[in-house]
A protein has these predicted regions:
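Alpha-helical transmembrane segments of multi-pass integral membrane proteins
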Residues: 21-22, 106
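Alpha-helical transmembrane segments of multi-pass membrane proteins
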Residues: 14-21, 55
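Helix-loop junctions at the membrane interface of multi-pass solute transporters
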Residues: 1-5, 19, 118-124
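Juxtamembrane loop-helix boundary motifs flanking transmembrane segments in multi-pass membrane proteins
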Residues: 4-12, 28, 93-97
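Transmembrane alpha-helical segments and their short flanking loops
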Residues: 30-131
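Helical hairpin unit composed of two closely spaced alpha helices linked by a short loop
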Residues: 22-32
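Membrane-embedded helical hairpins/re-entrant loop segments and their flanking transmembrane helices
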Residues: 1-16, 42-46
Length: 131
């Protein structure tokens, strides 16, 4: 209520939206997959990029909101695309090493996406929010 969101929406829609609306997670998965493929010597075709984007989008919907969950999903996408040689695993370990600050940025993007949805649906009481 302090932020201008009705209690009925905050108790049901926000938890559901935070699980389903993970834009930052999907974007990070695609960027990390392309980075890892490039480091490992794979050539990513436009068709493969579309498949990676679809996999990341679908996987991000079911990704739990827990630290490190995105890294597990990333490995699943890499395995599904066949990017599993030694170079890919080394690049994946580099992503794991810097994953904590990346997750903070990804979470920020997820929250901004949820706020944009709330604003576009008219669910945000601006007079309360702007106080």
């Amino acid at each position: 209520e302090e932020f201008g969101v009705d209690e009925s929406i905050a108790s049901f829609v926000l938890p559901l939206g935070m699980t389903i609306n993970m834009d930052g997670t999907a974007i990070m998965q695609v960027i990390a997959t392309v980075f890892i493929a490039g480091c490992a010597g794979y050539t990513v075709t436009p068709g493969q990029l579309v498949v990676v984007a679809l996999l990341a989008l679908l996987a991000s919907v079911g990704t739990p909101a827990a630290p490190g969950a995105g890294a597990v999903i990333l490995f699943t996408i890499l395995s599904g695309m066949g990017f599993v040689n030694d170079g890919a695993l080394l690049a994946y370990s580099l992503i794991l090493a810097i994953n904590r600050p990346i997750e903070m940025l990804v979470t920020s993007l997820n929250v901004v996406g949820s706020i944009c949805v709330a604003k576009s649906e008219g669910l945000l009481k601006e007079d309360v929010y702007n106080k």
